[in-house]
Amino acid sequence: MILRYLDEALEGERLRRSDPYEHAVESMLIAKEGPITMAGYVYVMNQDKTQRETLNEKLLSLYRDINNFLMEHSPEGTFLFESFGLAEAVFTPVFKRFWFLDYYEGFELPVGSDYARVKKWRAACMAHDATNQVTEEEIVKLYYDYALGAGNGALVDGRKVSSFAFQPSWEKRPMPPRDKYETTASDEDLGLFVMDITFNAEDRNPIYVSPNSG
């Protein structure tokens, strides 16, 4: 809904298809975003190893469904239509967040006709110049707590800092451990630390001091 509003409100070429039939087609594809997003988040937050195969198959079934849709409406194309459009703008952030599944669950789309078309589409979406705001390293580091079952900024037991903390920046942190089922990294392991807050006696401006600053 927000993307549709921005597409209509901002200046520039519209992503939304102007042809009523084509807009209906892209809307049908966009409607598939919710279920696949939910399946991906349930998968990455899962803490029960016995459920991995079930969750993996659930996500694969949704990819197969999108593959079938693309084969019906754009079997030879790269995008749904001739260029990156509204459907691609909706799905690309999801595909990029799913880097956390590649890293923490070893997820990958199988080789074969059931996935070939959606793999082509996904790769084109993620390679588009307009989608380079985030990197795989950033997603993997920020979403570590999700991989341990703690979403929306919740703290993992025994931790004092969320992996979504702004400081220290993700670029300065080490990569988290891949094995989320057997290993739980500490704040120190993740390059996170609690900031002690003191105040300047004259102007009361806060001064942030790292415990390791001496």
What feature does the model see in each segment?
Residues 1-83, 119, 150-214:
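GST-like domain detector, emphasizing the conserved glutathione-binding G-site
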Residues 6, 98-99, 135:
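Activation segment
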Residues 16, 108-111:
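Membrane interface segments of multi-pass transport proteins and intramembrane proteases
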Residues 29-32, 43, 92, 137, ...:
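Short acidic/histidine-centered micro-motifs embedded in hydrophobic/aromatic stretches
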Residues 45, 107-108:
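Short glycine-enriched, charge-decorated loop/helix-capping segments at active-site entrances
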Residues 81-105, 114-119, 125:
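GST superfamily/GST-like fold recognition
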Residues 113-155:
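A contiguous, mid-protein "functional segment" used to position or interact
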